[in-house]
Amino acid sequence: MSYQAVIGLEVHLQLKTRTKIFSSCPAEYHGAEPNTFTDPLTLGLPGTLPTLNREAVELAMMFGLSLNCDVSGFTQFHRKNYFYPDAPKNFQLSQYDRPIARDGFLDIGSERVRIKRAHLEDDAGKLTHPTYAPYSLLDLNRAGTPLIEMVTEADITGAEQARAFLETVQAIAQALGVSDATPEEGKMRCDVNISLHRAGEPWGTKVEVKNLNSFRSVARAIEYEVSRQTRVLGAGGRITQDTLGWDEGGQKTFVMRTKEGEADYRYFPEPDLPPLDITPEWIERIRARMPELPAQKRERYLSTGVRAAEAQTLSLNVALSRFYDEALRAGPAGQQPDAQKLANWLLTDVAGHLAAQDQNITQSALKASHLAALVRLIDAGTISGRVAKDLLPEVMQGQDPETLVQERGLSVVTDTAAIDAAIDAAMAADPGTVDKVRAGNTKAMNALFGPVMKAMGGQAKPEVVRERLTRKLGL
């Protein structure tokens, strides 16, 4: 009997606040010189006292509500004690037994992943270990920035489900504006707890893989650990409860330390911060501020006729969905572009151009109204799809497609005499194909269709060309 994976995630999001969680020190340090975004509290100097950041609390409440959690009416902070250079206070302020949110869920496709808790805490500094150097470098700019840590129940069963879950969490955080949630900047980090068991048997010993900073790394670490633990258990070995790191170059895990338990941290209530009471009225004010969430956006797109795959892709990308919504609203009343066709153009043709330029939609000169106009021109039969594709590079540079079509005379040719002349020329140039078609090989007609469309510069409607070509061939 094969083993089944039991996976839980711990996701850390850096909240998008102006200042750090317990002091007035600015929180947006990215790109700054090391140790330039610090203050006495960040440095852990004696006599400094924390003051809780209200903005961080409200962002955490909003995030908890988006995960279908219950927001606690009473919460408090505890000291999590440990000695490490990146924590100059020698403790982290976290929420131990009274998190700000608990008992939520997210639906990933047809599967539900339960959210155990989400709690606030301050981040640590950053240690860098130069190769072969007898020292380490410490940057405390990150220390004290607000984090929300979300912990799932062990409901995840595989790497792709974990990846889809993280993509959904990222989309929610970005839609709410609570976090940039960019793994490449360290603003979204993930720890993975993995164990194996056979169906009907107790769960096995779990390991924790720490500080995975990309969704791809999460998926690969899970795949590697499932494979490794399967080999160990299959050979009669035992899994030890270790904390593991992920070697991106070697694509494997390595032991960092033996896993600590809660007793090792000696939690106790923070004496310098009073407990926080959160009233129902405060919760409802936060709920009223919440924008449309990805799941709601997906349902809205489906209701307009967008296919499930495109609706999912759009709903998980904040920038693309904003651009799409703007394009969908563009134009005179009653003349909006077809929703599915617009999605196709944005996610296929436009996305291809952006990828070739190593850009995202916010960096492009493309205007939503211009993409909408391009799709409307196709819908109205004013231009063909081929002409639209030829125009797209210029439209991507900010050109108005309607102006380009008018100035260059690119409208669809409706003159059947011109189409018939192009057909006659193609048939005269390839009599062998004409004979094949008339002998019953109708597929050979495509060899005539292409030259006709080329002669018309892509400005003839394909269905008109095919109908008149069929008539000319006597079919």
From Swiss-Prot:
It holds the Pfam family GatB_N. Allows the formation of correctly charged Asn-tRNA(Asn) or Gln-tRNA(Gln) through the transamidation of misacylated Asp-tRNA(Asn) or Glu-tRNA(Gln) in organisms which lack either or both of asparaginyl-tRNA or glutaminyl-tRNA synthetases. The reaction takes place in the presence of glutamine and ATP through an activated phospho-Asp-tRNA(Asn) or phospho-Glu-tRNA(Gln). It is an enzyme of class 6 (ligase). NCBIfam families: gatB (TIGR00133), PRK05477.1-2 (NF004012), PRK05477.1-4 (NF004014). InterPro entries: Asn/Gln-tRNA_amidoTrfase_suB/E, Asn/Gln-tRNA_Trfase_suB/E_cat, Asn/Gln_amidotransferase, Asn/Gln_tRNA_amidoTrase-B-like, GatB, GatB_Yqey_C_2, Gln-tRNA_amidoTrfase_suB_CS, Gln_synth/guanido_kin_cat_dom. GO terms for biological process: glutaminyl-tRNAGln biosynthesis via transamidation; translation. SUPFAM superfamilies: GatB/YqeY motif (SSF89095), Glutamine synthetase/guanido kinase (SSF55931). The keyword Methyltransferase does not apply. Heterotrimer of A, B and C subunits. The gene is gatB. SMART domains: GatB_Yqey (SM00845). This is Aspartyl/glutamyl-tRNA(Asn/Gln) amidotransferase subunit B. It catalyses: L-glutamyl-tRNA(Gln) + L-glutamine + ATP + H2O = L-glutaminyl-tRNA(Gln) + L-glutamate + ADP + phosphate + H(+); L-aspartyl-tRNA(Asn) + L-glutamine + ATP + H2O = L-asparaginyl-tRNA(Asn) + L-glutamate + ADP + phosphate + 2 H(+). Keywords: ATP-binding, Ligase, Nucleotide-binding, Protein biosynthesis. PANTHER family: GLUTAMYL-TRNA GLN AMIDOTRANSFERASE SUBUNIT B MITOCHONDRIAL AND PROKARYOTIC PET112-RELATED, GLUTAMYL-TRNA(GLN) AMIDOTRANSFERASE SUBUNIT B, MITOCHONDRIAL. Its EC number is 6.3.5.-. It comes from the Bacteria. The keyword DNA-binding does not apply. Belongs to the GatB/GatE family. GatB subfamily. GO terms for molecular function: asparaginyl-tRNA synthase (glutamine-hydrolyzing) activity; ATP binding; glutaminyl-tRNA synthase (glutamine-hydrolyzing) activity.
